[in-house]
Amino acid sequence: MEERQVHVVEIRAPVADVWAEITKLRQIQKPMYGTVLDTDFKPGSRMIYRSEDGKRVFILGEIREFVPPKRFVHTFRFTNFAESPTLVEWDLQEVGGVTRVTVTHSKFVDQKKTADSVRTSWVGILKNIKSVVETGNVPFKTRLVLRLMSAFMYMAPKGTLRANVPELKETR
């Protein structure tokens, strides 16, 4: 199995603006498929990407490194896959008013479902971040998808229900 995936996008905006979008807390992150990020960004702390109402958790991780506005490293596990966590590294570099965002997703050992899923989803996420930072919104097609996802949230896998995530049972 491949050991790492690298995805890059260049965004015509200062690094501070891009960083603010990537690390936005407790608000809907349209680029991240309408999820809400909860964490305190301290190394060792838990992080989750959840539904707006908090009833579903899609991604669970642990903060490994947080160096604003340049680097953000965390583990990553889809709650609906019975797979071990992988590692995500966000690296941002600004040159001449353009910010290069590099996402390196690694530590795939037996995580075939995760690897297959993120191979295409990172491309869409980075494209959406670029659109939000440069234009103020995600592309029209993404807005439609987000509406559909919201309307059909009740059909999301049962493994995403907060009550079904073993690591979160004590924080119900």
Give the positions of each predicted feature.
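Short coil-to-beta transition motif at edge beta-strands of beta-rich domains
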Residues: F41-M47
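Generic structural detector for well-ordered beta-strands
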Residues: V8-R12, I48-R50, E62, D91
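Hydrophobic pocket/interface hotspot
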Residues: V18-I22, I28, M47-Y49, I63, ...
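Hydrophobic-ligand binding "helix-grip"
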Residues: L37-D38, D53-Q111
